[in-house]
Regions:
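Short, glycine/charged-enriched secondary-structure capping and boundary segments
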Residues: 23, 43-46, 86-89, 127-129, ...
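Residue-level recognition of oxygen-bearing side chains
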Residues: 18, 28, 54, 125, ...
Length: 300
């Protein structure tokens, strides 16, 4: 792909110098580089740290040094209550981002982030796998029929990033309100769209590091989140390291969480098969599949 507006570099977020070179003359940065495959990160956790944590530090330091106006870091629902190496590394990525945002006095750089769930048909996601299995005449394999995941289109994910770009302040994390579905519902929606509603589904059990459901906001974050309509904004904790004052000063919001709840894929809007099918039809590849074409549905 050729465009006068694009310039490509060979580099790596692990290589600070290559990032510094790419950052020259840049106004805005969208940091999406990551190791995101949960099982791979379970077996190679330090590789996740080097890319997701130290790589983020390299990006932010280079952006600040180059005088970049705005940086948006992309995170994941797996960073909330993390139980796997990928989620832990992305939670640390968020902490690195928020910490960097606290030290920007005298600069023109704003650093904020987004957190979202499953982007349907993205690279490495389950929908392209389901489609391949149907075409191959193999049973669709699911880990746990009751497992729920947030469902977002690629367009939704882009909208979230642009919203953060336009409205973010230093240390903010933005979450888009999204529906969810069980993996079983998703499988039946895919087979129905492909004209094979009776295609067999096989339960194989969970993979390394998987959760039954995902959360986009913890209870503690929900207590301080600002509802912005289609989005939540979680501001950075503005307190400093002067712990002496905490002897007689607390934080009221943390006492409000005892009877609250997090925002997760079990308590958000739940899609049935018909609703999931309608959401799938927002994807061009799934529209073509519904017309009987043989296509690659993977997006991004």
């Amino acid at each position: 792909y050729h465009s006068a507006k694009l310039k490509f570099y060979i580099g790596d977020v692990r290589d600070a110098r290559s990032i510094e070179q790419a950052m020259r003359g840049v106004d805005y940065v969208f940091h999406a580089a990551a190791l995101k495959q949960v099982p791979s990160c379970e077996f190679h956790p330090m590789q996740a740290v080097r890319t997701n944590v130290l790589g983020t530090e390299n990006v932010l330091e280079a952006a600040i040094g180059a005088g970049v106006k705005r940086v948006v870091c992309l995170s994941t629902d797996k960073a909330v209550y993390p139980i796997n190496a990928m989620g832990i590394s992305k939670a640390m990525m968020e902490k690195v981002m928020v910490a960097a945002s606290r030290n920007l006095e005298g600069t023109h750089t704003v650093i904020c982030g987004t957190r979202y769930g499953n982007v349907m048909a993205s690279r490495g996601s389950v929908i392209p796998l389901f489609v391949q299995q149907v075409f191959a005449g193999q049973p669709i394999t699911i880990t746990d029929p009751a497992m729920t995941r947030f469902m977002m289109t690629l367009a939704d994910a882009v909208d979230l990033v642009l919203y953060a770009f336009e409205h973010g302040r230093n240390g903010d994390i933005f979450v888009q309100k999204a529906p969810a579905a069980t993996i079983e519902t998703l499988a039946h929606a895919v087979t129905g769209l492909m004209g094979k509603p009776e295609h067999p589904v096989q339960v194989i059990g969970t993979r390394h590091g998987e959760k039954l459901y995902e959360a986009l906001l913890s209870r503690e974050e929900m207590a301080c989140a600002e509802d912005m309509g289609d989005y939540f904004r979680v501001p950075a904790d503005s307190r400093d390291l002067n712990y002496g004052k905490y002897v007689d000063q607390g934080q009221q919001r943390l006492t409000q969480t005892a009877h609250g709840e997090d925002y997760n894929s079990h308590n958000t809007q739940r899609l049935d098969v018909a609703g999931m099918r309608q959401l799938l039809l927002k994807l061009e590849g799934m529209q073509r599949l519904a017309r009987g074409e043989v296509v690659d549905v993977e997006e991004g």
